[in-house]
Amino acid sequence: MKPVYVVLAAIAGLLLIVFLGYYNLYNSAVRLQEGVNEKWGNVQSAYQRRADLVPNLVETVKGAAKNEQEILTKVTQARAGIVGINEEITNAKNPEQLEVLGKKINTAINLAYEAYPQIRSTENFQGLQVQLEGTENRINRERDLYNESVKEYNTHVRGFFASMFLNTEKFPIKEGFKAAAGAENSPNVKF
């Protein structure tokens, strides 16, 4: 084989290796950049879940608490009616009045018993706390995954060969998630 062909084959082989290296470098950068974008989308999705969920949960718990307050008020009034009947029994003059008052007591007791469902506002508040905690944990997890993805991407594009060959406009350095000023203070949920 002629030396010219050997040199040309070596140059062609070297160019092929450089091209394949650049091809791999570029595709890896694209894959990592899309991974960063996906993770940020997941963070945004978790924020949206919180924005949708928390006001609805708060209103649901408020409504249940209000309903239970109304029920307790009615039960208290029914009990007060029974106390009033007890005073009438003391003042009753004949057995017929006592029988009518006895029926009133039975009716009041039955109404109080039927109107006194199992009170669940404490369970609702605990459920709200669990939902809030779960939502905040999801958001935090998505932020962590985003930051890990940004780190992997930035490490790749700032590497020696990548920084020499990749266009910094197409593959800029990404910023990790940073908390807003005052975010170290947790938000207050008001009822």
Predicted segments with their positions:
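A helix-centric hydrophobic-segment signal that preferentially recognizes long
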Residues: M1-F191
